[in-house]
Amino acid sequence: MFGFIHESIRQLMIRTYGEAFWSKVLERAGFEAGKENIINHYYSDADTFSLVDAVSVILKVTREQVWEMYGCFLIQYTMETGWDDLIRSMSPNLKGFLDNLDSLHYFIDHVVYKANLRGPSFRCEDNPDGTITLHYYTGRPGLYPIVKGVLREAAKRVFKLDVSMTITGRTQRSVQMATGERIEEHVIFLVKTLNTDQSNEEALGTAVVQHSNNYKIRLTHMDFISTFPYHMVVDQDCKIVQVGRELYNHIPKDLLSVGTPLMRIFEVTRPQIPLDFDSICNFINAVFVLQVKTTPMEFQRNANKRAAQAIEASENLYEDNNGALALSQSQHLKLKGQMMLMSSGGHIMYLCSPYVTSIPELLQYGLRLTAMPIHDPTRDLILLNQQRLSDVEMNLQLEANNEQLENMAKDLEVEKGKTDALLREMLPPSVAQQLKQGLSVEAREYEEATVMFTDVPTFQQIVPLCTPKDIVHLLNELFTKFDRLIGIQKAYKVETVGDSYMSVGGIPDLVDDHCEVICHLALGMVMEARTVCDPITNTPLHIRAGIHSGPVVAGVVGAKMPRYCLFGDTVNTSSRMESHSPIGRIHCSENAKKCAESTGRFEFEPRGRVQIKGKGEMNTYFLLRSFKRSIWEIIDRRRDENCNSIDGYNELREGYVDDVLNKVTQKNSKTCSIS
């Protein structure tokens, strides 16, 4: 169905039950919010019924009740959206309004929205008791409650009438149409006016001119077929009696001879009825659209011309594919007009014009505007509709652009999220937020922070014996484990250079236990490193670490690829602690030891005075364990009770891991584990 139907259903539900209710309907119907009410989009009947069924289930009412409620609202919403004047000007009485329902529906579908939808058909009959019998035909069974709602609301709003509607008959049958077989539902309504103080006859008025047969029509046969170049007259057997002269330009002359059955030349596309005399009389108030069955004359003339040219050029006619292409693009002429029962009662005249609403359609039929009589409003309609089509095309383009912009905005948000995540990886969150806001980040001096460097002492021996891919895999596996620990311990990763990994505590967010955090991080890194295998010896990898506490200056360096860098003697001393550390040990300065013990409880082993390059002799220490947290708590992993010590610090002793690994069978894995 047309998107207007979905939008009007949405408006009804939101106005009556609120936005939250409509969200529930969309969720149950399986629609994405915003995709269910695109005005110029065609939705399948299944989509529309899924919305109505969802409303029915949530409200706990029948589908028929929902459709009838919608019918009442449809008139209100239609009149609100610019159709008020047209609906009120259709007829002075209810009977005339019902007679023109078919034409109104056709106009909205085919002219305004250019939708070519399978709309319903209506036929109206007066009854002697003043009631009206309304026949409703549709190819969509089950929608008849909409008619009840529409008619009652229209009678009330337009004619100030209260009407009752009773269903006196409802049948379904299979109808063979040109497009195939379909199920057609026929519902008969008895419409009765309740406030009888107003009559349908009141507004009919009286004739201004007296009927007279004293004068004969002063119009010859040739004048008539010239004035109405597309008309046809048929008898009770629906055989041709008379045709307009322009039809000969589109239909072979032998088919337009007197006595040719109308159904041999045309097929009826609207209303969906058999092409016989009685059916036409039943729908005499409807708009009739007939389509020529035969090959368009324009195509035949072009085909004959191409054949003659091919013969002259001694070409094989069957090798010319242009004919097939032209046939597929050719248009069978459609006629639209009114069927009129002539006074004799035995003939019907079809006053019509080519069903053309735009310049491109006019050209497809091989027509020009001069083919239309000057009095024919089709000329004005084509010109006006050409402008309307331009407006519709612009609206469609705007809708497409809006949808594209929405999708681009969503994609932009996704990419922005990725960029923000990457920026947060490169810079501290607080610093990254300042840069996003366009603020400059000034360098800052921190009175005390703790810096740690770690590296792989055997890295220089590993590199010559491995492929670059193996080296990258090794470092990626190792640093991924370190990054996880950084997140657990709430420290900050500054940078990695080769096999060196630099981290800091107390920067950029000030904390009192920055050295305690880094000490726990160091213990965890030594433990996690041993779960990575040396690709040469296939043994657990050993790292070393150096820690120092002191004043640090931190700031953002660079514009194109900004980096958060640390400067000062503390950074240099920390690097010296790492470079002078034995393999597998955590080497700390005296400042770091004192700072760690001020907030935490650790076991340190004095190393004595060590000659440090550029610093002279310094008192240094080895970090052995934390008394506040076990290794398993630090690395956030479960302990294997079968082979792991209670606190995990025994595993840090050099050689202990090798003893455990000898007892545990490992299957072709490049990752070592102590569990």
Curated annotation (Swiss-Prot):
Changing D499A: Little or no effect, suggesting that it acts as an beta-like subunit. One of its GO terms (biological process) is feeding behavior. One of its GO terms (molecular function) is oxygen sensor activity. Expressed in URX, AQR and PQR neurons. Residues 450-578 form the Guanylate cyclase domain. The keyword GTP-binding applies. Its EC number is 4.6.1.2. It holds the Pfam family Guanylate_cyc. The keyword Kinase does not apply. It is found in: Cytoplasm. It is an enzyme of class 4 (lyase). Its cofactor is heme. PROSITE patterns: GUANYLATE_CYCLASE_1 (PS00452), GUANYLATE_CYCLASE_2 (PS50125). Keywords: Behavior, cGMP biosynthesis, Coiled coil, Cytoplasm, GTP-binding, Heme, Iron, Lyase, Magnesium, Metal-binding, Nucleotide-binding. Regulated by molecular oxygen, which binds to the heme binding site. Probably not activated by nitric oxide (NO). Mg(2+) binds at D455, D499. Binds 1 or 2 heme groups per heterodimer. GO terms for cellular component: dendrite; guanylate cyclase complex, soluble; neuronal cell body. InterPro entries: A/G_cyclase, A/G_cyclase_CS, H-NOX_domain_sf, Heme_NO-bd, HNOB_dom_associated, HNOB_dom_associated_sf, NO_sig/Golgi_transp_ligand-bd, Nucleotide_cyclase. Belongs to the adenylyl cyclase class-4/guanylyl cyclase family. Heterodimer; heterodimerizes with gcy-35, and possibly with other soluble guanylate cyclases. This is Soluble guanylate cyclase gcy-36. It comes from Caenorhabditis elegans.
